[in-house]
Design a protein with these regions (language model features):
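Short beta-strand->loop
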Residues: 37-46, 59-61, 86-89, 173-197, ...
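A bilobed periplasmic-binding-protein/Venus flytrap-type ligand-binding module shared by bacterial periplasmic
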Residues: 69-76, 116, 188-189, 198-211
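Early extracytoplasmic/lumenal segment of secretory-pathway proteins
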Residues: 1-27
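Flexible hinge/capping segments at coil-to-helix
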Residues: 77-93
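Hydrophobic residues within well-ordered alpha-helices
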Residues: 8, 31, 149-150, 205
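Ligand-binding pocket segment of bilobal, Venus flytrap-like solute-binding proteins
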Residues: 102, 106-109, 113-187
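Alpha-to-beta junction loops
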Residues: 11-20, 36, 93-95, 151-159
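A structural signal for short loop-to-beta-strand junctions that line the ligand-binding cleft
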Residues: 15-20, 38-72, 86, 97-99
Length: 213
């Protein structure tokens, strides 16, 4: 939640928090950098969660993974038309892409991934060129992007992969129709390519928890 780290920092030893759970590795780093997490001495966690999904000093652990993938209209976008995240910047997709706001942590994560892969100059150009392809002003959540594709507002978007499952098996028949309109594309899957961007949800024990045991 926005501002939670600052609140915990301000509360200090008086904080009532015991466990901190959050949806992005960037947020976990924020809590760690602010010294808000306590080391966890758990053989069960250490044996079951690999080193790359936890902090070096075991203050936080990844608990689930998700991929940021491309979702396309399954009839208007043919298989193979888009295979890499970089291709979203191609001018041929002008007016075809929908997006939730770039300020959201999910999109900041994918931007960081592209920045790490391409470098600052190329990543900035990619972002600007992709924005130029937007069909409308960024708005809504990931579900809203699938709905927009279903309703013909655009043909391409980025979503977390699990949202497709939520829609496909929704109790709401209208949401199931949205899912039926689209196809997921896991980008950058060719041999030697870096694969889709994967982020984590994770958590740790609050530094001043009274219930660490």
């Amino acid at each position: 939640k926005k501002g939670l780290a600052q609140r915990l920092k301000a509360e200090g030893e008086n904080s009532p928090a015991d466990v901190i759970l959050t949806v992005d590795i960037g947020r976990l780093y924020v809590y760690d950098d602010l010294d808000l997490l306590a080391p966890i001495d758990s053989k069960k966690l250490q044996n079951n969660i690999p080193n790359y999904l936890r902090s070096p000093d075991n203050t936080w652990f990844g608990l689930s993974k998700r991929a940021r993938v491309i979702v396309v209209h399954k009839e208007k976008i043919l298989e193979g038309d888009i295979t890499r995240i970089e291709e979203l910047a191609d001018p041929k997709w002008k007016g075809k892409i929908c997006s939730r706001p770039g300020s959201h942590v999910y999109n900041r994560g994918i931007m960081a991934s592209v920045l790490a892969a391409l470098g600052e100059e190329k990543a900035e150009k990619w972002a600007k060129d992709m924005v130029a392809n937007f069909a409308k002003r960024p708005q809504g959540n990931d579900r809203a992007q699938v709905k927009a594709i279903h309703e013909g507002e655009c043909e391409i978007a980025l979503i977390n992969n699990y949202y497709f499952g939520k829609l496909k098996f929704s109790e709401d028949p209208e949401q199931r129709k949205w899912a039926e309109s689209v196809r997921l594309v896991f980008p950058n899957q060719a041999e030697g390519d870096r694969g889709a961007h994967v982020n984590i949800s994770g958590g740790g024990i609050a530094k001043f928890s009274k219930n660490k045991e």
